[in-house]
Amino acid sequence: MNQPIPTGSRDILPEEMRELRAIESTLAELFESRGYGEVATPTIEFHDVIALADRPKDGSYRFFDEAGSMLALRSDMTVPIARLVANRFASQDGPFRLRYSGSAYRTVRPQRGQMREFRQIGIELSGAAAPGGTVEIVELLVGALDAVGLDRAVVGLGDADLFRQLLADMGVEGAARDRILDCLARHDLVAIEAEAGDLAGIGEEQRAAIVALSSLRGGSEVLERASEIGGAAVERASSRLAETYEGLEAKGMAGRVQLDLGLLRDLGYYTGAILEVYDPALGHVLGGGGRYDDLLGRFGRAMPAAGFALYLERVHIAQAEEERMAREQGARSKEQGASGVGGAA
């Protein structure tokens, strides 16, 4: 009898497992070479710890232990590591450079093809403020993508506070604000336009600003355009993005980064720069991260922090697709070369 497994989970067979381990090993060696030491945290945390992430939609699997305490499977890796840094390095000075790999778990929406269990590999840098700390993690992220053959991948760079401040200055609050932020997190620009059209108490110019900023992306030129559209409301976020982008230009990394002013993630702890990774060979985000300068303070050890995580299975799929495309391009070039030689004869 064929026994099914839950939707959103999967078995991994030996060949794929070897390939996943190879990616993991390559990235682990890179992170270690940059001074990031490996840590591990429990799969199970007290739910109160997970709740400190302040995610609008928690998504964690919760249950009770024998003593009646509410526990949860970790729904990401950043929060447990923030707890670890605050608890285990309480008397030490930073910065702390840590790396990890492990599985996280979230509830899924039926029929969406979402995974309940997903493996992440990433780094967390605690005790390094922006813009220097942000530049460091973006530089390492680009290096990680190159190390696994994803040199066409692009890092989207936005700011978590840009739209929050813009909407606050417009007086957009409560459920209306949350709907727009949710649309941004889902990259649903059509829905943003609809939501902006339904907002009460703001003018057409403000509606147009919401829609225009949500789709504004490119190089440093977009920051000037953002100031023209959003005015003082976006000045702080634009200034931070400009500082980070200048640091990336100095490192020769700006060509791999796209400023995306509509970028927002559904994790409530981000406070400044936010990142997402895209590769043209895959229609899904490969990973993401950003700054979470307030999160460690919730555990009693206030310090600036930033990090990123890559979805291991998605990186593997993108890598395989890039290799397939390279083989096909090589075969076409060979055929064209042979055809040219034959024609000359």
Which residue ranges define each predicted feature?
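Generic N-terminal amphipathic, Lys/Arg-enriched alpha-helix
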Residues: P4-L13, A226
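Positively charged, Gly/Ser-enriched RNA/tRNA-binding surfaces
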Residues: E16-R34, E45-F46, P56, T78-S91, ...
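Polyanion/phosphate-binding surface patch
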Residues: V39-L71
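Residue-level "edge-of-site" marker
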Residues: I44, G158, I180, L261
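Acidic, His- and aromatic-enriched active-site or binding-groove loops in soluble protein domains
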Residues: G59-A67, V172-E193, D279
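Short, conserved phosphate-binding/catalytic loop or strand-edge motifs used
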Residues: E117-I121, L157-Q165
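Short polybasic linear motifs
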Residues: A331-Q336
